[in-house]
Amino acid sequence: MNIRIASTVLCLSLVVGGCARLPEQLPNNPKDQVDLDIPRPTGIAAAPWPAQEWWRSANDPELNRLVQIAFARNPDLRAAAAKVLLAQADVGAARSRLLPHFDADFALTQQYFSAQGLHLSANGTSNTFGALNPIDIHYHVDLWGQDRDLVRAARGRLAMNQAEAAQARLLVSTAVVVQYFALEGDRRLLQQTEHLHTLQEQAKAVAEGGFQQGLFNASQIHAEDLALAESAQRIAKLQAAIAAEKHALAALCGEGPSMTIGSATITKQALSPALGLPKNLPLRLLARRPDIVAARWAVQAAAAEVGAARAAFYPNINLRLLAGWNSIHLGDLFNPGNFAHAVGPVITLPIFEGGALRAHLRAQNAVFLAAQDRYRSTLLAALRQIADRLSTAQKLARQERAQRHAAAAAQAQWELRQQAWRQGLSDALPSIAAEITCVQVRQRRTAITTARWQNWALLESALGGGYRHTIKDG
């Protein structure tokens, strides 16, 4: 009896005190808070959150078609979807640790025993060993929560990958919209520049006629030649930019450079010139931005991995049940006397691991601290993006107002000079020059309009692009 008590005390002391020693202290990150306040600039009214298919606000069928093609064929989106499938499989693998494992095994071995061997009854003979175990059950007793932590970590990585897949869709749709607006803006600029080139050719013809009549000197012709060369260069640059933008759109859509990109049908009424911010923006932004959601789930997954690493310092307990037959002679394998069974716990004590467990715990804790910092960095970047879009919107609105005044003044000047030319009070050159000024003003307005379209798309993206956080379990 005393021997049993002593054995029990010895086992308990090994279980409690014989495990690998936990680190005395792990580094900790200060729980500093991020200021989520975004100043609302003057003139920015309240507005709803972006719709899930926010780009449809442009009312452009060609743009809608391109975004849908990109969603279906973009290779980056397919890779992100594959990562979600992998994470779902990882969740299933982690969950399997919580359940008993049922196996069956059969072994057949032919062996010859030496004449002077240790098996006296079998020495000098050849025998066939047979072992059949139809029941072999293993169950890990998750006493310290290691398996549960691993499941939580896998679920966290699944949610993170789902959010990252949503972020990839948002980035692709935003890139398509911004690139499409750039293409449409350059197409309009090309038309205007070609018109400008035609007017400059007319101005040169008038200057040459005036030179022959002695009304102008050669410097006027040289000035028109210089203007023609500059507009020709501008046309070449715009043509190259349009080709590059088409190629970029085709790549985003998972197509080759020969993909056909139709013309835009965007109207002034398609996109509201007055941008707005949703109410309760700072708090709701946490669940509206997929990159923020992904970063938050990365923190939770890393925290669960720290818990699993801590549990590795404690005894590992497994239960095993084994039942079957084994015999040194295959012919009598199923005799009742050859039936064997075993049941009991298997306890593994991590007494000395050469510092491996401590190093693994410190590594997981470092991953957790890095995930916290990435979360804060992602949140700060999101706030900065929104603030940048708002300030850009204000700047473009001021430029648009200035260009409207410039367009009105240029139009009035052209009408006066056109009237003077028709009345014979001047030659055609001042009228052509005034029309050239009108075209140049329209070019600047086109550039501003394109920038406003792109800024609208970037703001919709910065607000999450209609994303709402949901978890699809594996």
Language-model regions: role of each:
Residues 147, 156, 163-281, 392, ...:
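Periplasmic alpha-helical coiled-coil/stalk elements that build and connect Gram-negative outer-membrane
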Residues 78-79, 95-96, 141-169, 219, ...:
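Sec/SRP-type N-terminal targeting helices
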Residues 211-215, 421-425, 462-466:
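A short glycine-centered flexible hinge/capping loop motif at secondary-structure junctions
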Residues 2-72, 131, 155, 239-287, ...:
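Terminal intrinsically disordered/low-complexity segments used for targeting and assembly
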Residues 63-65, 86, 130-132, 178, ...:
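Transmembrane beta-barrel architecture of outer-membrane proteins
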Residues 67, 134-136, 180, 282, ...:
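Membrane-embedded beta-strand positions in outer-membrane beta-barrel channels/transporters
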Residues 49-58, 105-136, 259-278, 307, ...:
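Small/polar, glycine/serine/threonine/aspartate-rich low-complexity segments that form flexible
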